[in-house]
Amino acid sequence: MGGMTVLKLYNTLTREKTDFRPIDPKNVRMYVCGPTVYDFAHIGNARPIIVFDVLFRLLRHVYGTDHVTYARNITDVDDKINARALRDYPGLPLNEAIRHVTERTETRFLEDAALLGCLDPTVQPRATENIPGMIEIIETLIAKGHAYEAEGEVLFDTRSMAEYGQLSKRNLDEQQAGARVAVEAHKRNPGDFVLWKLSAGHEPGWESPWGRGRPGWHIECSAMSGRYLGEVFDIHGGGIDLIFPHHENEIAQSRCAHGTAVMANVWMHNGFLQVEGRKMSKSEGNFITIYDLLHTEKFGGRKWPGEVLRLAMLMTHYREPIDFSIKRLEEAEHLLSKWPVHGSASGEADPAVVAALTDDLNTVAAIQALHALAQKATADARHLGAFAASAALLGVEPKEIELDEAVVQEIDGRVRERLELLKSKNYAEADGIRADLLARGIQLKDGKDPETGERVTTWEVKRSQV
């Protein structure tokens, strides 16, 4: 179906939604900025993880599972990591402390992503494994007049690129310096940003033509995307907060180093996330990690399944701001509870679900179509294959519900009690037991034993309110 389905994607670069035409349909390439591994991922970080996982699934559906390359980096060199290492492991040499921080944080991130139902990206490069590529790009930028050395740093000269500010639509004269760069006298322009900086003796560093040092924030992604996807690739994604300065500076570095008209053809950004109507922050007391949500009772007094968090995120279009709340999680859980548990996703995905997703990842419409299909599948098992394949596109797949043994025994007892009531023709009380169990998500099925002809009753969990 690859030649038949056309995706429409909103491109931040052009501020338009247009047909997506990959450079090479046999190798569609997407890069998404991954975590800086100094702290555990919070629910705001979960949004791009989930959104671009859905896009990855959709691209694989349209172009084939072997024809999509998805790169999501791990930033494991950063001053925030250094600070966290000094705080958490004061008795260790800094490099060893840094390794402890990055390894534990990366491991937790990958566990979180898996519990949110995300596929592994094709490649997950670490910044520390790509330092030579960064140095090479910086050397090229200096040689081409786009970068300069000053007081132990190598800086990008923003005035050297006529189209700087194109992504964020900022005029260079109006711009403030980048988020991680202080305005200092040694800069030619206030907006010039660091490509390389010298490291003190105790700090992590790599040998370079400019002395032992470490890379700036932005050069890392230019090097890793270029290495794994090429000088120009199809899609670059991330949160809306990365448009400036990070993505703007990535574009400047890559285009000026490679002499290309674009870095990526399509730039996609997911919207901001608030918690219960307020900006999420530690000072507000509403800072929630993915781990906290899934494994503790810090939010709403209970643990939440990963598929509930995932569906709650997808119930808002990815470009819209999202207000994350207990109510939203409850709504997502209620919706999931009405969907059939299924096995293999061997059917054909529902055209209405595919059509919604190919319209700039309209997950809201896709969920509505999936819910309609769920109702059909509940009534007629022939629709289960289509439901399973469609749910797999969203990565939201209802799980089998495991009940405590005590609950199972209690339900079995109620079923036996009902059978006795039916034998004595006490239908009203028997119907009352059926209704009580159904209200808890337990559906009874009456039949006959083929050998004895006696009435038998089986039950199954249809909803998650048990």
UniProtKB/Swiss-Prot annotation:
In the UniProt record, does the keyword Cytoplasm occur?
yes
List ligand-binding residues for ATP: K282
- Any one of the GO BP annotations: cysteinyl-tRNA aminoacylation
* Source taxon at top rank: Bacteria
Q: Supply the EC number(s).
A: 6.1.1.16
Q: What is an example of a GO molecular function annotated in this UniProt entry?
A: ATP binding
What top-level class of enzyme does the UniProt entry assign? ligase
UniProt-annotated location(s): Cytoplasm
* Cofactor binding note: Binds 1 zinc ion per subunit.
Q: Needs which cofactor?
A: Zn(2+)
Q: Name one GO cellular component term.
A: cytosol
Which family, according to UniProt? Belongs to the class-I aminoacyl-tRNA synthetase family.
Q: What is this protein called?
A: Cysteine--tRNA ligase
